[in-house]
Amino acid sequence: SLYAPSAVVISKTQGASADAPAQRAVTLRCLPVGGDHPAPEKACAALREAGGDPAALPRYVEDTGRVCTREYRPVTVSVQGVWDGRRIDHAQTFSNSCELEKQTASVYAF
């Protein structure tokens, strides 16, 4: 292939620790698009737009005007694998699942 591989495992955990057992995890492959992520095309496009940096996703997500409550029910997500030939090991905690979806769009929507 002419392109460097991009394949990651994305997981979601209730709570503020990435060390807790994942409640759900999916695989995502880009070029060719696949894995068991429910919307791989959208997730690959979002990561591509963010330069493969999951921490940068909020800067690229379209503001839908969605309003979230201030409820604190932390959700921690992680992305591990290879993006465009570079190793990724990212974890981030959001104050609740609404904030997670609002700030990251389709990548963690599973």
From Swiss-Prot:
<keyword id="KW-0722">Serine protease inhibitor</keyword>
<dbReference type="InterPro" id="IPR023549">
    <property type="entry name" value="Subtilisin_inhibitor"/>
</dbReference>
<feature type="site" description="Reactive bond">
    <location>
        <begin position="70"/>
        <end position="71"/>
    </location>
</feature>
<feature type="disulfide bond">
    <location>
        <begin position="30"/>
        <end position="44"/>
    </location>
</feature>
<comment type="subunit">
    <text>Homodimer.</text>
</comment>
<keyword id="KW-0964">Secreted</keyword>
<dbReference type="InterPro" id="IPR036819">
    <property type="entry name" value="Subtilisin_inhibitor-like_sf"/>
</dbReference>
<comment type="function">
    <text>Strong inhibitor of subtilisin BPN'.</text>
</comment>
<protein>
    <recommendedName>
        <fullName>Subtilisin inhibitor-like protein 1</fullName>
    </recommendedName>
</protein>
<comment type="similarity">
    <text>Belongs to the protease inhibitor I16 (SSI) family.</text>
</comment>
<keyword id="KW-1015">Disulfide bond</keyword>
<dbReference type="InterPro" id="IPR020054">
    <property type="entry name" value="Prot_inh_SSI_I16_CS"/>
</dbReference>
<dbReference type="InterPro" id="IPR000691">
    <property type="entry name" value="Prot_inh_I16_SSI"/>
</dbReference>
<dbReference type="GO" id="GO:0005576">
    <property type="term" value="C:extracellular region"/>
</dbReference>
<dbReference type="GO" id="GO:0004867">
    <property type="term" value="F:serine-type endopeptidase inhibitor activity"/>
</dbReference>
<feature type="disulfide bond">
    <location>
        <begin position="68"/>
        <end position="98"/>
    </location>
</feature>
<keyword id="KW-0646">Protease inhibitor</keyword>
<dbReference type="Pfam" id="PF00720">
    <property type="entry name" value="SSI"/>
</dbReference>
